[in-house]
C-alpha cells in the first residue's frame, strides 16, 4: 500500500515500524547513547527506536529534544525515519538537523493500518509511505 504525506525532512528510510499512540519527548524520554525509550510512563518504555521507522502522533517537551535527535544520529542510535501524525517544531528541527527522513499528515489512518514490526518505507523525497 502507498500513502501520501507531507515532507518535513527529505531522504528515504526503511525498517520495521515501531508504533505509539502517545507523543514522545526525546529530552529525558530517550537515551541518545542506546536509542532506548527511558520514559517509564511511555508505552514504548524499554524499546529501542534505533534503525526503526518511528510512528508517533507528535512530540512533546523541551526544545533541547532537537539536539537529542541530532546526537542520536551522531551516535548511530537514531530511527531510520520518523512519521508523525502532526509534526511539531521540536522533532521536525531535530530530524532536519540530523538528516533523518521525516513526514507527517498521512492521508490514511496509519495507527489503524500499521502494527509493530511491519516493514515500512518512508520516501520523504516523494512524500510517500509504503508498506
Swiss-Prot record:
Catalytic activity: (R)-5-phosphomevalonate = (2E)-3-methyl-5-phosphooxypent-2-enoate + H2O
Single GO MF annotation: hydro-lyase activity
Active site: 62 (proton acceptor)
EC number: 4.2.1.182
Biological or metabolic pathway of the protein: Isoprenoid biosynthesis; isopentenyl diphosphate biosynthesis via mevalonate pathway
Record-linked SUPFAM superfamilies: LeuD/IlvD-like
Keywords for this protein: Isoprene biosynthesis, Lyase
Record's keyword annotation contains Lyase: yes
Superkingdom: Archaea
GO biological process, alphabetically ordered: isopentenyl diphosphate biosynthetic process, mevalonate pathway
Quaternary structure, from the entry: Heterodimer composed of a large subunit (PMDh-L) and a small subunit (PMDh-S).
Function description: Component of a hydro-lyase that catalyzes the dehydration of mevalonate 5-phosphate (MVA5P) to form trans-anhydromevalonate 5-phosphate (tAHMP). Involved in the archaeal mevalonate (MVA) pathway, which provides fundamental precursors for isoprenoid biosynthesis, such as isopentenyl diphosphate (IPP) and dimethylallyl diphosphate (DMAPP).
UniProt similarity note: Belongs to the AcnX type II small subunit family.
Protein name: Phosphomevalonate dehydratase small subunit
Amino acid at each position: 500500500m502507498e500513502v501520501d504525506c507531507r515532507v518535513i525532512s527529505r531522504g528515504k528510510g526503511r525498517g520495521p515500524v515501531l508504533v505509539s499512540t502517545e507523543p514522545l519527548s526525546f529530552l529525558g524520554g530517550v537515551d541518545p547513547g542506546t536509542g532506548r525509550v527511558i520514559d517509564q510512563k511511555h508505552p514504548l518504555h524499554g524499546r529501542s527506536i534505533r534503525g526503526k521507522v518511528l510512528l508517533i502522533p507528535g512530540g512533546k517537551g523541551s526544545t533541547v529534544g532537537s539536539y537529542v535527535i541530532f546526537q542520536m544520529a551522531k551516535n548511530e542510535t537514531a530511527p531510520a525515519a520518523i512519521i508523525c501524525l502532526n509534526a511539531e517544531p521540536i522533532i521536525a528541527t531535530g530530524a532536519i538537523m540530523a538528516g533523518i527522513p521525516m513526514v507527517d499528515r498521512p492521508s490514511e489512518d496509519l495507527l489503524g493500518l500499521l502494527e509493530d514490526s511491519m516493514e515500512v518505507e518512508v520516501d520523504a523525497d516523494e512524500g510517500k509511505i509504503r508498506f
